[in-house]
Amino acid sequence: MVNFEGVKGLENCKWEQRNANGPVHDMPRYDVSIPYLRMLPGPLDYTPGAMLNATRDHFFGNNNHPMNQGTRVHQMAMYTIFETPLQMLSDAPHKYRRNQECTDFIAKVPTVFDETVVLDGKVGEYIIMAKKAEGVWYVAGNADDF
């Protein structure tokens, strides 16, 4: 077993509905809850890496041009924070070609780590993690403050 599903991944943003207050679901808050709750039993399959990002005020579900709530940096941090030995990409290849810095980061960040330390955090608000792979530490943080 490499990854377990059981996560509301980014594909759900394609059909995300809005109400008077914005999107029905707060994906950045969800993203900073997963490490504390869903990752306890083991690796997950989330598919981060959305290249079209928006604030809650500007986000809307769209099958043809899917977007995500939050920032691109939020998306990149999930590649380190989430335990996912078989990592995936959530967007179209041409979007990664247009965002070479992100593509290079995704290609270089390990998917398996030797050591993990939660440096600080609060469920549903933020998380800061350090992970070590082959003697190199990777530090990432995410928050629900978009």
Q: What would you call each of these model-derived segments?
A:
Residues 1, 48, 92-93, 141-143:
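Active-site proximal loops enriched in glycine and acidic residues that flank catalytic Cys/His/Asp
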Residues 1-65:
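Aromatic- and carboxylate-enriched substrate-binding clefts and catalytic-loop regions
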Residues 6, 48-50, 55-56, 92, ...:
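Solvent-exposed, flexible loop/coil residues
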Residues 35, 70, 119, 128-130:
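Residues embedded in well-ordered secondary-structure elements
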Residues 46-91:
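Charge-patterned, long linear interaction tracts outside catalytic cores
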Residues 53-55, 88-90, 97-99, 137, ...:
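Flexible loop/turn segments at secondary-structure boundaries
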Residues 73, 77-119:
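Catalytic cores of secreted or luminal carbohydrate-active enzymes
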Residues 123-146:
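Carbohydrate-binding surface patches
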